[in-house]
């Protein structure tokens, strides 16, 4: 049986159409992917992302433990700060990409991808040294994402703190949304400004309804996984299983900024990632824009000078650009801007060119 989030019973009320997403029954859309995408880019959207995993790390050795496992430098995090990072195998392949929240000295929360929860927790448990506790709290926590240029104004009306003061990648874990206690962080996965709200399962419906009611006049709409994917894709935010995997390193995927090879602590995968950072990886994640008519899709082969150079990781018709575009992991010789390549679509090789990414960048 598919897993369900605490908000499942509300989906129908708002017109949600559900799909099987990695063993979860989640809404792919409420109105339409295009409308929801547009709302987040211009007004605001609300997502149920309660399927994401949360892991609590505590103990006096929690910092050295995280420094060993994660590619970013956790020692730079202050209380109330969040950091994007990756967890890698010794060969540099990616176990997961995740967020680390520092709640207090020796108290951290990791937010991990739903499909990777068991694998990630097993990996962490295998590497425990000293005074470290790893607790999977995924089933106790719901997560809502309020995203878009009007997100701040909407949240301001119902939150007890002035959350406008939160800078990106900062959070408050003593916030109240309506009458509900929550952790609110200025983070997201859309390329827009926004907030992620962590609360107890039993409080999720209350926050969901309150936000949608409060934001109605500002154009806030409920959004599904379809728009979440097109939004993150335009902003070139990687999705595990597509742009990142056990066979793709963070450097290849273009998130080298989250790999600190100069941090004082050694970490798993460092040798390979340091070499790729210094000398360049053999493959690179690049943007494609179709010249011929066709939409590049995940897994489609890409050819350069008659030979396969890699494949598409994600592709669609961009709702913002109104163009058929894709991300592709290609051999470095095929990656120069304006290089013409061919994408195999329905047994035909169609022309595309390498373009700049991200496809969309929010204007401050």
From Swiss-Prot:
GO MF terms, alphabetically ordered: aminomethyltransferase activity; transaminase activity
UniProt keyword annotations, A-Z: Aminotransferase, Transferase
Entry keyword annotation includes NADP: no
Enzyme Commission number: 2.1.2.10
Enzyme class: transferase
GO-annotated biological processes: glycine decarboxylation via glycine cleavage system
Reactions it catalyzes: N(6)-[(R)-S(8)-aminomethyldihydrolipoyl]-L-lysyl-[protein] + (6S)-5,6,7,8-tetrahydrofolate = N(6)-[(R)-dihydrolipoyl]-L-lysyl-[protein] + (6R)-5,10-methylene-5,6,7,8-tetrahydrofolate + NH4(+)
InterPro entries for this protein: GCS_T (IPR006223), GCS_T_bac (IPR022903), GCST_C (IPR013977), GCV_T_N (IPR006222), GcvT/YgfZ/DmdA (IPR028896), GcvT/YgfZ_C (IPR029043), TrmE/GcvT_dom1 (IPR027266)
Taxonomy, superkingdom: Bacteria
GO cellular component, one term: glycine cleavage complex
Biological function: The glycine cleavage system catalyzes the degradation of glycine.
Similarity comment text for this entry: Belongs to the GcvT family.
HAMAP family: GcvT
Complex and partners: The glycine cleavage system is composed of four proteins: P, T, L and H.
Name recorded for this polypeptide: Aminomethyltransferase
Native source species: Bacillus licheniformis (strain ATCC 14580 / DSM 13 / JCM 2505 / CCUG 7422 / NBRC 12200 / NCIMB 9375 / NCTC 10341 / NRRL NRS-1264 / Gibson 46)
Lineage, uppermost ranks: Bacteria, Bacillati, Bacillota, Bacilli, Bacillales
Gene coding for it: gcvT
């Amino acid at each position: 049986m598919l897993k369900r989030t605490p908000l499942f019973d509300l989906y129908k009320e708002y017109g949600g159409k559900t799909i099987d997403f990695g063993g979860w029954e989640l809404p792919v859309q409420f109105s339409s992917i295009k409308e929801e995408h547009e709302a987040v880019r211009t007004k605001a959207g609300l997502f149920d992302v309660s399927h994401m995993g949360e892991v609590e790390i505590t103990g006096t050795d929690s910092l050295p433990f995280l420094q060993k496992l994660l590619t970013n430098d956790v020692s730079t995090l202050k209380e109330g700060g969040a950091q994007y990072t990756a967890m890698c195998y010794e060969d540099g392949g990616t176990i997961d990409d995740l967020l680390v929240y520092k709640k207090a000295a020796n108290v951290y929360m990791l937010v991990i991808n739903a499909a990777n929860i068991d694998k990630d927790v097993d990996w962490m448990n295998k590497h425990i040294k000293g005074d470290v506790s790893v607790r999977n709290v995924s089933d106790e926590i719901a997560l809502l994402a309020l995203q878009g240029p009007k997100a701040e104004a909407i949240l301001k009306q119902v939150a007890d703190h002035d959350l406008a003061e939160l800078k990106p990648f900062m959070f408050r874990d003593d916030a109240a949304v309506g009458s509900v206690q929550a952790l609110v962080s200025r983070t997201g996965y859309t390329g827009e400004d926004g907030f992620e709200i962590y609360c107890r399962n039993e409080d999720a419906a209350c926050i969901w309804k309150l936000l949608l009611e409060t934001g109605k006049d500002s154009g806030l709409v409920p959004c599904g996984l379809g728009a979440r994917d097109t939004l993150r894709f335009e902003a070139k935010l990687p999705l595990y299983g597509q742009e990142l995997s056990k066979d793709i390193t963070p450097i290849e995927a273009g998130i080298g900024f989250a790999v600190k090879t100069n941090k004082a602590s050694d970490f798993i995968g460092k040798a390979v990632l340091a070499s790729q950072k210094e000398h360049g990886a053999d493959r690179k994640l690049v943007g494609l824009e179709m010249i011929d008519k066709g939409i590049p899709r995940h897994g489609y082969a890409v050819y350069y000078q008659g030979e396969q150079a890699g494949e598409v990781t994600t592709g669609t018709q961009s709702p913002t650009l109104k163009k058929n575009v894709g991300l592709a992991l290609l051999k470095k010789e095929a990656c120069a801007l304006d290089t013409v390549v061919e994408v195999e679509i329905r047994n035909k090789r169609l022309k595309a060119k390498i373009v700049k990414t991200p496809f969309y960048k929010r204007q401050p």
